[in-house]
Amino acid sequence: MSDEIEDRPRTRSRTPSVDTQSYTINEEAHHIITDSDSSSSENEDGEGNETNSSDDSSESGSVERFLDEIVPTTSTSFIPNDTPDPATLFDITEYIFDSIVQSTNACDFSEAFALQAKTSAVINSKSMELKNLIEQTKVRLPELQAKFKNGTQTLRTIRKNLDNAKSRIQVMNDVLQTDYPIEFNQARDKILERTLDSDEEVI
């Protein structure tokens, strides 16, 4: 019996063992599945990029740490690191306030005001005197100009009279020297040889 079973040709049944209609996928479900697959693939790609970027950043950070260990960092500031902050050493506002307070305490404002009032009074009095002198000069200047003009005219007249007297004396000398030569010479010698007294010298 068993041999007969083995001798029979093995045939495969073509009838489906499972109802395939119950497992058919409609078009809408197919689209949803494909969309979900694409989104999942995109998410996987984004995660891959993020992991790559994180890997790159970690690698760059490790390189920077390696360079920091090899090359010592130099301080660009002129102040050493162990020195305190300059702002704590010197406060400009406090210094200005203290200097103003000291100056106000050292100065006596009453004396300063008194000196200022005295100085202003002296300046005002001197300015009034100067104004009075200017007014007097303006009044006297025309008078002095008129006197100077009259004096120049008088000077011209006196000079003219002196020239006339000189010419007359010269004419008289010529006439006397011609008409009376002996007497003229004697008189001239007497005048030249005479000695002046003290009173005459003073005069």
Swiss-Prot record:
GO terms for molecular function: exodeoxyribonuclease VII activity. Residues 1-62 are annotated as: Disordered. Residues 14-25 have a biased composition (Polar residues). Its main location: other. PANTHER family: BIOGENESIS OF LYSOSOME-RELATED ORGANELLES COMPLEX 1 SUBUNIT KXD1 (PTHR37787:SF1). It comes from Candida glabrata (strain ATCC 2001 / BCRC 20586 / JCM 3761 / NBRC 0622 / NRRL Y-65 / CBS 138). Residues 49-61 have a biased composition (Low complexity). This is Biogenesis of lysosome-related organelles complex 1 subunit KXD1. One of its GO terms (biological process) is endosome organization. Component of the biogenesis of lysosome-related organelles complex-1 (BLOC-1).
